[in-house]
Amino acid sequence: MCEERKKLLEIKHLKKYFPIPRKITEVLSKKPQKSVKAVDDITLDIYEDEILALVGESGCGKSSFARTIIRLYDPDSGQIIMDGKDITKMSKKELRPLKRNSQMVFQDPYSSLNARMMVGDMLKEEFLYHHICEPSEVDGKIKDILEKVGLSDDAIDRFPSEFSGGQRQRIGIARALA
């Protein structure tokens, strides 16, 4: 007998369009607003223990799709169902507990890290914002996560500029795990 897999994420007909700015003459002549179809009617399911890789040409909508799924962008239409809950119309407050389970690891790690913050402070911010553990446990949790991604404790007191590109990618993964 086949065991039923748990569906973690269900995307139904998701669309996200970005308006193209119009020239003043187009506004005055009442020409219709044109838009870039960054995400155009995507439907897919992701099940427990699956990994999804978005692959495509530069500018084809991969990042826009991911940002729309985790609601950094509001979708124009469609549904995003996470763990059986339709998050498409949820407020930021309602989304907060769900965002704990959905994090992005950006392909350019340097641009996603705050150059003025030490790695330990960035990770601490994640733990405190999401109320993951008691404040007294945070330092130990940070060391554990850094170890999981292959970085030593000395990373805690260093800035992103002091790391290689691969190490910065691991810092991004550590933030997602936190």
Question: What kind of feature is each model-predicted range?
Answer:
Residues 78-86, 98:
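Conserved ABC transporter NBD signature motif
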Residues 159-163, 167:
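Conserved ABC ATPase signature
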Residues 70:
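Helix-to-loop junction immediately C-terminal to a conserved catalytic motif
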Residues 55-56:
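The feature captures the beta-strand-to-loop junction immediately N-terminal to the Walker
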Residues 86, 136-154:
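Conserved ABC ATPase "signature" region
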Residues 173:
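Hydrophobic anchor residue at the start of the ABC signature
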